[in-house]
Swiss-Prot record:
This is Phosphatidylinositol 4-kinase type 2-beta. Residues 289-297 are annotated as: Catalytic loop. Keywords: ATP-binding, Cell membrane, Cytoplasm, Endoplasmic reticulum, Endosome, Golgi apparatus, Kinase, Lipid metabolism, Membrane, Nucleotide-binding, Phosphoprotein, Transferase. Pfam families: PI3_PI4_kinase. The keyword Endoplasmic reticulum applies. It comes from Mus musculus. The lineage of its organism: Eukaryota, Metazoa, Chordata, Craniata, Vertebrata. One of its GO terms (cellular component) is plasma membrane.
């Protein structure tokens, strides 16, 4: 259905799907030499250029020098722009994983579409067909033009007044996924699997009929009329930008374990570990204002058989993450970072607020971990700047909309700070009035926020039609 709608697709999406393709084999060696952070990935034309060493030019195709006319015509035709290069200078381990995924695609081990969910997301595999990550292309997000699932299309046709989430920027889910991981790292929470922005191309992705026809036509021209085919800038399908999250093994949906824990209560030390992990999930969701956190999209890892003897015989130090016997993984963070609080049809509540764990006040350990960060305005400013560096890589980046997103996030941080100081519980935190903290710059016009900036606090009084509280 998405292919049929392609001719009327917005021009911005059309441009995005028609960028040059990555060199397929020869890029492997340069990547190992200079892998870098996805947050520092170079911006597209028209966006601010990120200041990153050794990434101002497209990477060399071979280890001996840059691309030249003497190289093969195949490399010339697949030469890429720097905006589509998967470089991760600060994380060689992640770079190797992405490289394995690309090499697997080269030999025909394609990403597999995930049947669950309302968007086009894919299990990415290595050459041994082991799942190593989850890729969510921007163009196949829930409200994207190339979403292969019918759920949102039916929603749009049958109930257009409620279609979409009016508080979220459209087609920014991949940045939200990467932004959630950034917040997780900054706060030292350790519950979001590593997630960064990458470019991938695969036949199993959902492309428009036009893109597939052009790809077939170019291949046919190259085969029948090589002189003409060699003039094409790219042979093959265009790469897609999206979020790449490392796959976590041996985890199950929280819904399964929550039911088990009701019937079979946890030992006290394990219960404390779970409570600590749960509080970190609450903090993450609240700061980024996750609008899609149900008990089916966060995971729990707990092998009671494996750890039974250890649980009974030891009083484990549950603060030490290395000895954690139960862990939480916060996945599906693509519907977060709203530019305003939900105030239209639905409230998008935090479903964890109704769990028994949400009635327990935040522990002293959690307060000691989080308060030093979020009560420091320098830390909050630094967090906003890091998110700015990430979000501005999108072609449709809008500075005013980003400032609104940060105003909501600062308001969430303000509420969280007060709740931790007052010893409130997660449920009480979720019931606090919504606040917006806007920044009005004075003097110099910097990137995001300055120490000399003044802030205006506003209570958001408008309630959605279907309110949860």
């Amino acid at each position: 259905m998405a292919e049929a709608c392609e001719p009327t697709r917005p021009s911005e999406d059309e441009d995005e799907e028609r960028e040059p393709l990555l060199p397929r084999v020869a890029w492997a060696q340069p990547r190992r030499v200079a892998p870098g952070s996805a947050v520092r990935m170079q911006a597209d034309e028209g966006a601010d250029v990120l200041r990153e060493p050794a990434t101002d030019e497209p990477p060399a195709v071979s280890g001996e020098g840059s691309i030249s006319a003497s190289l093969s015509t195949e490399l010339d035709r697949t030469r890429t722009t720097s905006s589509e290069t998967n470089t991760f200078l600060e994380d060689p381990e992640f770079a190797d994983i992405v490289l394995k995924a690309e090499q697997a695609i080269e030999i025909g081990v394609f990403p597999e579409r995930i049947s669950q969910g309302s968007s086009g997301s894919y299990f990415v595999k290595d050459s041994k067909r082991n799942i190593i990550g989850v890729f969510k292309p921007k163009s196949e997000e829930p409200y994207g033009q190339l979403n292969p699932k019918w759920t949102k299309y039916v929603h749009k046709v049958c109930c257009p007044c409620c279609f979409g989430r009016g508080c979220l920027l459209p087609n920014q889910g991949y940045l939200s996924e990467a932004g959630a991981y950034l917040v997780d790292v900054k706060l030292n929470l350790g519950i979001v699997p590593k997630t960064k922005v990458v470019w991938l191309v695969s036949e199993t992705f959902n492309y428009s009929a036009i893109d597939r026809a052009k790809s077939r036509g170019k291949k046919y021209a190259l085969e029948k009329v090589p002189k003409v085919g060699r003039k094409f800038h790219r042979i093959g399908l265009p790469p897609k930008v999206g979020s790449f999250q490392l796959f976590v093994k041996d985890y199950k949906e929280a819904e399964y374990w929550l039911r088990r824990f009701e019937a079979e209560p946890l030992p006290e030390n394990i219960r404390k570990q779970f409570q600590s992990q749960f509080e970190k999930l609450v903090i993450l969701d609240y700061i980024i204002r996750n609008t899609d956190r149900g008990n089916d999209n966060w995971l729990v890892k707990y092998d009671e058989m494996k750890y039974a003897k250890k649980i009974e015989s030891e009083e484990s130090n549950w603060i030490d993450n290395k000895q954690l016997l139960i862990k939480i993984a916060a996945i599906d963070n693509g519907l977060a970072f709203p530019f305003k609080h939900p105030d239209e049809w639905r409230a998008y509540p935090f479903h964890w607020a109704w769990l028994p764990q949400a009635k327990v006040p935040f522990s002293e350990e959690t307060r000691n971990l989080i308060l030093p960060y979020i009560s420091d305005m320098n830390f909050v400013q630094d967090l906003c700047e890091d998110l700015y560096e990430l979000f501005k890589t999108d072609k449709g980046f809008d500075r005013a909309a980003f400032e609104n997103q940060m105003s909501v996030m600062r308001g969430q941080i303000l509420n969280l700070t007060q709740a931790l100081r007052d010893g409130k519980s997660p449920m009480q935190l979720a019931q606090m009035p919504c606040v917006i903290v806007e920044c009005s710059k004075s003097g110099s016009q910097g990137r995001v926020v300055h120490l000399g900036s003044s802030f205006t606090q506003t209570v958001h009084c408008r309630k959605p039609f279907f309110s949860s509280w």
